[in-house]
Amino acid sequence: INRDKKQLLLVLGGPNKYYSYDRNNLEKIFENLKNLAKKYDLQIIIIPSMRTPINTIEHASSFFDKETIIVKNVDKKAYLSALSISEFLVITCDSTSMISEAALTGKPIYVAQIQSKKDDYRFRQFRKLFTKLNIIRNLEDKLEVWNYEKLDETNRVANIIKKKIYCHF
């Protein structure tokens, strides 16, 4: 980790029935991140998920320079550490669960769009809600810091249950 730079984390999902991880989609995302890292003097960290194909990780390794940290295997400690130390989070659009996990941090989350193979209505509705809640923005050519209320559904629901229980006594 380069302590003289802020970190930008890219969490890669993987192909599913809605999204393919073809070279063109990846090239657009990688090129955009490379430009943002240069523009804002950032170090990139790339973390795979269970669905990330090995050839996607290999492509990232050949595309980025040696300053980019690429975790080659799924590693929960590396994932949680990277979420913690990174100033900016970029998550591919194919994973609602990784976007939700990132929203627990309260940090700016950018969604890297991938062309869908078929109607991705459920994914679009999820992203529409998170955009409305000011949690996510589309990855483009600039980075900003913004605030939103962290998602903490476990405590929120626990408090509702407590109130309902106390009302019965």
State the predicted function of each range:
Residues 1-169:
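Nucleotide-activated sugar donor-binding and catalytic core shared by glycosyltransferases
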